[in-house]
Curated annotation (Swiss-Prot):
Active site: 209 (proton donor), 341 (proton acceptor)
GO molecular function, one term: magnesium ion binding
Note on cofactor: Binds a second Mg(2+) ion via substrate during catalysis.
Record-stated family: Belongs to the enolase family.
Protein name: Enolase
EC number: 4.2.1.11
Major location category of this protein: cytoplasm
Locations listed in the record: Cytoplasm; Secreted; Cell surface
Chain residues that bind (2R)-2-phosphoglycerate: 167, 341, 370-371, 392
Pfam families: Enolase_C, Enolase_N
Physiological role: Catalyzes the reversible conversion of 2-phosphoglycerate (2-PG) into phosphoenolpyruvate (PEP). It is essential for the degradation of carbohydrates via glycolysis.
Pathway recorded for this protein: Carbohydrate degradation; glycolysis; pyruvate from D-glyceraldehyde 3-phosphate: step 4/5
Amino acid sequence: MAKIVDIKGREVLDSRGNPTVEADVILDNGIVGSACAPSGASTGSREALELRDGDKSRYLGKGVLKAVANINGPIRDLLLGKDAADQKALDHAMIELDGTENKAKLGANAILAVSLAAAKAAAQAKGVPLYAHIADLNGTPGQYSMPVPMMNIINGGEHADNNVDIQEFMVQPVGAKNFAEALRMGAEIFHHLKAVLKARGLNTAVGDEGGFAPNLSSNEDALAAIAEAVEKAGYKLGDDVTLALDCASSEFFKDGKYDLEGEGKVFDAAGFADYLAGLTQRYPIISIEDGMDESDWAGWKGLTDKIGAKVQLVGDDLFVTNTKILKEGIEKGIGNSILIKFNQIGSLTETLEAIQMAKAAGYTAVISHRSGETEDSTIADLAVGTAAGQIKTGSLCRSDRVSKYNQLLRIEEQLGAKAPYRGRAEFRG
């Protein structure tokens, strides 16, 4: 038994300079597992609650001392003496202690940090890498794959201070033979994109996730710039590299309309579905995230019926890693993929349940970071340990993003042929 003898919480900073929660879970043999909770900017209304202090005199109200106190008090008292290897029991005990639908009492940030720290401690106690322990918890021991990275190289929306409405423009090196080659391809495209933007006299400062954040004439202009960078890097768009969007449509859905302020265009749901379908015809876009507002289920159904047979339609704000909402979406034929962010639901156990439900229904699962990240690289192990096949963890700069890519390089080196990189086969259509 990996007996828990102490739990410590603390306030640390995320990549935006805002406080977040870190937890240590200490075992009787001296092993310490540590994990940090990430934080989002564009958040779904049904996400589990991130507990903030609201004290404007500290960190502009964004302190997390209440969540830390919950770790050092009630959560610690609850879990002392328990087995860190029994992930379900730990997570369910914390969920029960919280007693709310959205973890509002203890805070999803507090529960998640402890949940992940316990998993890390248990993996060390077993003498196995975290991805192997996660595969065991997932009921898929020894079944691994290296994920296709969805690299966010132009940032807009809530992730950047520019006039671009769509939040993320991503490249996917689907033609790579392994993850290391995929990472190299992405990095080369990123550097060529910088040169393309500079040649146009555009800003090459980066946004929250490390992508460039220039002012552009339209959303399609971002795609054209990326297409030029891919070509200049020596790759073939559509074969070696495909494209993906995260619209984060809930951020520009106003009064029942989709308002693209940067382009001066306003659409109803059917019109916006046509707009997105047009982009997929002109560019090899094989994945679109949050193409409709989280509450516009009729719009989502229309978009799914229109392009879902050939394009991966990912629910982020729509599903918020929540099995109850995902189940309803599956039953209604809404989308065909789920974005997995463990702080949306607040525990490792519930995260694994969402991945399992998605896969059982033939939906894909995309493991994702948040825009507010730390050096914690747990999502890399989660992607490999669940054989999810895809990961979103930002651009090719900023160490809060690159830490995940570097962990994936280490894992691929360890696993070799046991963790295949499947490229285009991981996507629909």
